[in-house]
């Protein structure tokens, strides 16, 4: 870690949201500094458990409502922000959406959203760690659907 920077630990939760085999993605454009397609996720608020955070963030960022099917795992990464090096852990959940409805949260710099076929979503995603979670989630979805357990 470069001198002068402090380490800040953060925890976020998010969802791979699926409806009728298609995956929800959001397009973020943060002041033209970075942009790309991402999965919905966000920070844990006081008093929330990880499942509550994942469902709230999906609803806030995309307008989509759904239910958690299962925990997918976590990923960790670091980035620099102002005077800190941020170490972020993201817990991911497989979520079944109620419909194809989505409305990007403009206040958080999301400018588009939609449901995409797996291969489209995989290639659209900006971050490699999110592509890995998407692959795991879609494999579980296919297994659950084949076994008649996808709801």
Stretch-by-stretch model annotation:
Residues 2-39:
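N-terminal strand-loop-strand
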Residues 123-151:
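Charged phosphate-binding loop/patch that engages nucleotide di/tri-phosphates or the phosphate backbone
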Residues 44-132:
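Unchanged
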Residues 20, 91-94, 150:
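Sequence/structural signature of beta-propeller domains
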Residues 14, 19-23, 50-51, 71, ...:
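A generic structural signal for ordered secondary structure
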Residues 1-6, 36-38, 70-71, 75-84, ...:
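Charged, low-complexity, helix/coiled-coil-prone segments
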